[in-house]
Amino acid sequence: MKTTLELLKHIREECDFLLSESKNLDRDEFLDSETLRRAFSRSLEIIGEASKNIPSEFKKTNSKLDWKGMAGLRDILIHQYFGVDYELVWEVVNSLIKDTKVIIDDLVNELD
């Protein structure tokens, strides 16, 4: 079983990937690229899965993040095999990941 620190580092890695790949990308380029759509979706799934496995007590004492929302997004992506809303994926990456990364960095630094 992975430690909380390892799980947070997984989340950070995926945030880094999403931020790096979306940096010089516009919405249409993202939507036109099947590879990027799949990669971004997978990264969000990994973030959600890692967040689900972080202990409840840790989440309670570190409530700056929407842990439930991260896990919920993962569930939506996992269970909608043929109908992933890539507009939603794009919006999440562009509106939430940067702030999530800042908080995750702080948590990793506290535990490391």
Residue ranges and their predicted role:
Residues 1-112:
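Solvent-exposed interaction patches of small proteins and small membrane subunits
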